Amino acid sequence: MGNVAGSAVEERREAAVLPGYERLGGAAPVVYPPGLRERAAEARDVLAAGSAALSEILGVEPPDLEALLVADADWGRAPRENERPYPPGLPYFTRAARPPALVLPETLSSVFRPRTAATGALVLWHELAHAFLLREPLPRTPAWLRELVPQALSAAVARRTGLLLERHLEMIDREPGFTARSFGRHADANGQMAFQNLLLALGDAAVEEFGEGFLRALAHELWEETDVVGEERAQALLADSLGPGGREWLASRPEI
């Protein structure tokens, strides 16, 4: 899941979410099935590093949550808000568990591309960023802004933890046939992945150009919004959070 290491205190006890599952305690607890303890420890370390970084970047305390590493055979029984299970292999954040949980699949879906040493950690940090952002009510926003913030946060965490992104970013298709703003919500899984990758590239470029401070400003602005955020307002929020030169920089970016 990446090369982030940690040393959280370990705890093993029976977990109530799924029968037979145990729990690794620490700053980022992970509930896991028999036979996947090593994977659980790896996920815990990646999440602990991400949680500490996101807390500093956003200026907030980490949310109360734990990760649930689910065996492929148990995927249909994982906690969720919806009646139907999520597609196999797709991580997600849910409040259907107590505490809320990041649900992680034993086998990551093949739709996640590119596959590099950074893929696993980026996926975990992306879902963790959503959990941080959902600590407060968020307004409805265009899809590109809703997903850009966690992608940019993932890139910022990677920079803080020393996870090398160069190879991963080099393998991203920068010309998928659409921009972040023109992307259609009814695209297939491959299109959705191309959309997310485009936003990761844009988010990393923004952090490179303006530093990570704009992410705190943008997140807090979104938490304070009370109305639906339309396209024009979304662009203004992002540009203003970037600071001087933000509007001109955005206008020059092919991704947007």
Tell me the role of every PLM-derived stretch.
Residues M1-Y21, P254-I256:
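N-terminal low-structure segments adjacent to metalloprotease catalytic domains
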Residues P19-W125, A131, R135:
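Juxtacatalytic substrate-recognition/specificity segment
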Residues I57-V70, P137-A143, L165-H168, L215-H220:
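Surface-exposed patches in mature extracellular/periplasmic domains of secreted proteins
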Residues T107-F112, E175-A189:
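Acidic/His metal-coordination segments adjacent to aromatic residues that form catalytic metal sites
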Residues A129, L133-P137, S154-G162, V207:
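Hydrophobic/aromatic-lined pockets within catalytic cores
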Residues L138-V149, N190-A194:
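Active-site metal-coordination segments of metallo-dependent hydrolases
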Residues A143-S182:
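Post-HExxH zinc-binding segment in Zn-dependent metallohydrolases
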Residues F183-I256:
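Pan-zinc metallopeptidase signature
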